Amino acid sequence: MERKITLSEDDRMNFQNTLDNLKSNSKWQVLKTYLMEMKIKYPSEYFICTELSNAYHMLGMYKESEQACMEAMQLEPNDVLVVYNYAVALYSNEKFSEAIVQLNRILKRKINTIAYGVHGEGMKWAMSIKNDSLYLKAICQLNLGKLKEAYKLIVKHLAQRRRGVYSDFTKKQVKRKEQYIINELNNKVVK
């Protein structure tokens, strides 16, 4: 899908600098207001919608986050980051099966396509988003009561973690969830 870019190069740089500054200082309310203004000014820029969804998410406004993601998906349904953010929003709204559908869209893609495709940001980024999709899918499966599937996905996520590849989830957090699932599986066997 060819999209018209309405932001000039200078506007994009200013936008990115403002975005980075507000995020690094955890000024989520200010960021939300800024992005809402930018969305009015540039309604066809899907990345503004997906960044707005992140701001809503950080503020605990999960319904609004999902709505902003849906708008981004309508504008650019093939950007892996947009799909991932939409899956996160669905998960946050306890729409686990719907989130899995979106995560599967990411997991089915070839790593090189994610890394170097139209919206790609390199191999480390592709490895990161694909592996985090595994973990998020595991948590969705866990919430659906599918312990064995969740466990397999967490084991795979842990096996694919690499030094220098970012994750939204700490290793400690993942290991705790893995142990929880092991305990739950053992409890089912005992009963």
Predicted region positions:
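Conserved structural position within tetratricopeptide repeats
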Residues: 39-40, 70-74, 105-108, 159
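TPR alpha-solenoid repeat register
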Residues: 48, 82, 115-116, 133, ...
